[in-house]
Amino acid sequence: MGCLGNSSKTAEDQGVDEKERREANKKIEKQLQKERLAYKATHRLLLLGAGESGKSTIVKQMRILHVNGFNPEEKKQKILDIRKNVKDAIVTIVSAMSTIIPPVPLANPENQFRSDYIKSIAPITDFEYSQEFFDHVKKLWDDEGVKACFERSNEYQLIDCAQYFLERIDSVSLVDYTPTDQDLLRCRVLTSGIFETRFQVDKVNFHMFDVGGQRDERRKWIQCFNDVTAIIYVAACSSYNMVIREDNNTNRLRESLDLFESIWNNRWLRTISIILFLNKQDMLAEKVLAGKSKIEDYFPEYANYTVPEDATPDAGEDPKVTRAKFFIRDLFLRISTATGDGKHYCYPHFTCAVDTENIRRVFNDCRDIIQRMHLKQYELL
């Protein structure tokens, strides 16, 4: 009995335990409430779009503009990726010279051994970037035949940053090379999986989710649809004369339009508005002004397209460029206005993802829209 009596707690002890439990519960509830409020206050943005549209570049811009950019160690880690871009670019161009129809010969036959060297190192994954490699790349890039093949890059699969890095081969080859922010923005690395970037603008928290755009990556998107404030859909406008990597047949811009339509009409996303980034405006302008690839050859309806009266061109913009960019904008708006249910809206913006000032201005313009979507999301509007 004595032992039992000693092990049992007095009413006073039990009261103390109960009080401690209540205090602990109160602290937990307070923390949970704090987390709920923080979650509700966060704007979650989902970046969607077809492969190579510029989604990851937008994320990099958010880091440059709103996080602290890239530290020296991160820049150092990107050197190998940038040099790999150089290798991929020159291998692709040199290999395409004999496969495109009609084929393109080297302008200087003395460069043949350089071309053979580049083709021989193509399959090597763990490649050492020697001075010999960079010298061959530089000489080949100066060859007018290689340049002529590059000009026909819509006929094969070439990364967008090819010209940018090939023109900067002298700096990229330096032993003490340090990539600039622009180099990091241009660097192409395939996005696989889901990447989250967190940043704050004027004390407002943003979580941006970047998902791979290639067809086999899209099944992962559904994981990100829960509680999204807005979708930022990125479309590469300059891709009107290109085909996708996945099948080497489907027009890239058509693929982007079809994907946009499937997202717009997705029953799980009927109340989520889309901010449309009509990207790669710089490359679109270059193609249109070069006049080699006519939009009407790929989109016959362009022949009868008239620019809307309310269209506002950029200062000094060529009318041909204005017509092209608004035509592509209207292809997307035709999809978003077809339903007309008033449950979600499409807000188009012309962007150049590698231009930091352009993205700063566009994102600032979007913040009011995102705020309204956020208030609507939690029925505060």
Swiss-Prot record:
Q: Record-annotated residues binding GTP? A: 52-57, 185-186, 191, 213, 279-280, 282, 353
- Per the record, the domain of life is Eukaryota
GO BP term, pick one: adenylate cyclase-activating dopamine receptor signaling pathway
Looking at the record, the residues that make up the G-alpha domain are 41-381
**Where is the PTM Phosphothreonine found along the chain?**
178
What does the UniProt entry say about where the protein is found?
Cell membrane
Q: Which InterPro entries match?
A: Gprotein_alpha_S, Gprotein_alpha_su, GproteinA_insert, P-loop_NTPase
The way it spans or sits in the membrane comes to: Peripheral membrane protein
Briefly state the protein's biological role.
Guanine nucleotide-binding protein (G protein) involved as transducer in olfactory signal transduction controlled by G protein-coupled receptors (GPCRs). Contains the guanine nucleotide binding site and alternates between an active, GTP-bound state and an inactive, GDP-bound state. Signaling by an activated GPCR promotes GDP release and GTP binding. The alpha subunit has a low GTPase activity that converts bound GTP to GDP, thereby terminating the signal. Both GDP release and GTP hydrolysis are modulated by numerous regulatory proteins.
Q: What is this protein called?
A: Guanine nucleotide-binding protein G(olf) subunit alpha
Q: Which organism does this record belong to? A: Mus musculus (Mouse)
Q: What is the lineage of its organism?
A: Eukaryota, Metazoa, Chordata, Craniata, Vertebrata
